[in-house]
């Protein structure tokens, strides 16, 4: 038979290259370290030119022109997705809300800062149903302004303009959110294997009475906040209130902000459930190519307009859903409500004996009126005693409600943008807000001669290399690239709560701070404690490198300010407390998660790569920077010298490695049986993991002594400057 003919009908692609069917390493070894979380959003996935800087591009944007286009869009109803009552405001607000609403304060991940709603899993979450249509409506505007306006900024701006177009005076808007180009790999959304799995299912995010797993804020896989029908879909406003309080607290919101956001979000727009959920097609990620990235395509009637199905709940909350007013509280508090089922079979609350004029009109026919609705979450604003007090206050004082909501909305949509120094645009509010972690600007810059003299003073102060290195590290390590909080700028390590954190070794910390403060007091020129802390670490690293035979100047840029206690929200900063730090070979207690996995999580938050993590661990060990001076992992006889000894001895087959207790190992000389060193899992993983060992071998080579020092200095400087947005 002809060979060409016999091959017809076979797959033209070798299955080894078919990513949809191949078995990858994590399938074979699911407990292996997932180093991929350290290698995201690099130039290989970024289509922009290497010199492109989004912040600089945004500065050239005509924001007023963009807003005018958005105002026009709000009432330019499209046949393929008609606007309710001829106004897209409610849809745009929901899109912006759900973009920002994934933020959680525990690890700073989620939120609106990256435009991640465009990608899986968020683009296909049940709670984000039909937001694909909102983004498609925005496409002409994104297309028009191009690279000057990111999707991340446009999504939030559209929500702001939607409110303004309906009568709310917003608090402000800041740009500066750069887009990502593929789904995030580091965010833990929960371990459930099905959408909207109830809390009694396997892999539940709940334990005990109803303890929500940290760092999660949403109550179900695929939801942004709480279940609108009630806990696990069972209506009970008081139980729902408990969920709301926990969820919003984990988003850094207090009770007043929670009521304001709930009411303000439901003052406009409507829920959609006028049909059966089974008429909806699959979510975007599961749809076929002809859907072109859209999902939830509705086969019921026209499938749009009054036939739209989204959450399954059907109706508007207020009489005038395209106007900013106090109608939410008028209806919620002015009527008694009873449970009903929507046409889609969802639980919702409807008013008893409502006046005809209080009913909102149909989205297409103004001669028809329908009952307003409330979700179980809305009823919690009435039934929970604390929420009720706030609701009544807002009802009696609409102006106060509008102000509180505008501020809470700004906080919701800007919380993960970081400090005010990252804000861009003409609508940035002048006021400094405590949740922005304000830091005073400095009015000095140290010259090279000043820096050299200060380093000499610090090294002559009697403080050890380890003391200087650990203090600088502890000050800087709180930075997290998820929401741009923490870092050495502000020197908050000298303030509550950081000065008392166990991981900061308060006694050692106060000793170092006193010496640095005395140096500061004796100077004729201005210099902040924040700068002195980092400069102390810089001087120590230079000295340790010199002692290793490598002369190198560690980069240092002055300009850090010193925050005050009044500028510091103690409760808000509590979430930044390190409970583990592999770089200092310490964790507060044993956790379910292995120490090396905790190391990866912390490393990712700090914005470091796998090889930067590797070189920093090796350097910190030989510098003697372990917590409380522990000897674990200090594979050197020259402590305080920036040598590659950690890697040389880790990869030396003259030694054998044996467990000696919980997270403790002994390094034994094979010939003599003598215990040479001790180590933890985060030390040995650099020899056991094949990828990390490949990096360790690079630094263990005979020709790597200078490369090791240079790479350590580069990674060290990156950590010290992680929060120096003024240097970017």
Swiss-Prot record:
Residue numbers annotated as active site: 98
Binding site for heme b: 266
GO cellular component: cytosol
Catalytic activity: H2O2 + AH2 = A + 2 H2O; 2 H2O2 = O2 + 2 H2O
InterPro entries reported in the protein's UniProt record: Catalase_peroxidase, Haem_peroxidase, Haem_peroxidase_sf, Peroxidases_AS
One biological process term in Gene Ontology: cellular response to hydrogen peroxide
Cross-link (Tryptophyl-tyrosyl-methioninium (Tyr-Met) (with W-97)): 225-251
Transition state stabilizer, annotated site positions: 94
Post-translational modification: Formation of the three residue Trp-Tyr-Met cross-link is important for the catalase, but not the peroxidase activity of the enzyme.
A molecular function (GO) term: metal ion binding
NCBIfam families linked: cat_per_HPI, PRK15061.1
Assembly and interaction partners: Homodimer or homotetramer.
Family under the similarity heading: Belongs to the peroxidase family. Peroxidase/catalase subfamily.
Protein name: Catalase-peroxidase
Species, as recorded: Shewanella sp. (strain W3-18-1)
Lineage: Bacteria, Pseudomonadati, Pseudomonadota, Gammaproteobacteria, Alteromonadales
Gene encoding the protein: katG
